[in-house]
Amino acid sequence: MFSHCWTNAEEILLEQISLRLARLLSARANTRVTSIFRDAQHSAEVAATGASPVVLSLEDDPTEKFTSVFEGKEVVYFSAGAGGKGGPERTTKVDYEGALKVFDAIELVKGTKPRLILVSAIDVRDRSIAPPHYVGA
């Protein structure tokens, strides 16, 4: 079950799972949603949810570009992930280093910082093979 109780919120979402969340949040009165994703080919799909599409790459774009999008927002939902594409190096780059980039971008926001909601997953079929960056902290 999904529950969202902030009013007059300006939300920001990151990556795949965000399509469903963008639809849910965009349907709420007084809520504006911005969705960040890396592939411009998804712009129409994102816009169809009611969210404002922004194309940025966790792998390639600098932290400051994310900060500029986060300015004035109340909440950042981080749900990005490599999704098993590109092997362990890409998973580390997106899932771990990408999360750090978002944390750093939020820290650079002037004034009130947006809250962060981190959506994460791990392969529970075999918990003994967790990526090192999931358990190393």
Question: Predicted segment positions?
Answer:
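N-terminal Rossmann NAD(P)H-binding glycine-rich loop of SDR-like oxidoreductase domains
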Residues: 1-33
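Conserved Rossmann-fold NAD(P)-dependent oxidoreductase catalytic core, especially the SDR/UDP-sugar
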Residues: 3-12, 34-36, 82-91, 96-137
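Short, structurally constrained coil/turn elements
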Residues: 27-29, 47, 110
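NAD(P)H-binding glycine-rich loop region in Rossmannoid oxidoreductase-like domains
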Residues: 35-108
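Short, structured coil/loop segments at alpha-helix boundaries
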Residues: 15-19, 39, 43, 63, ...
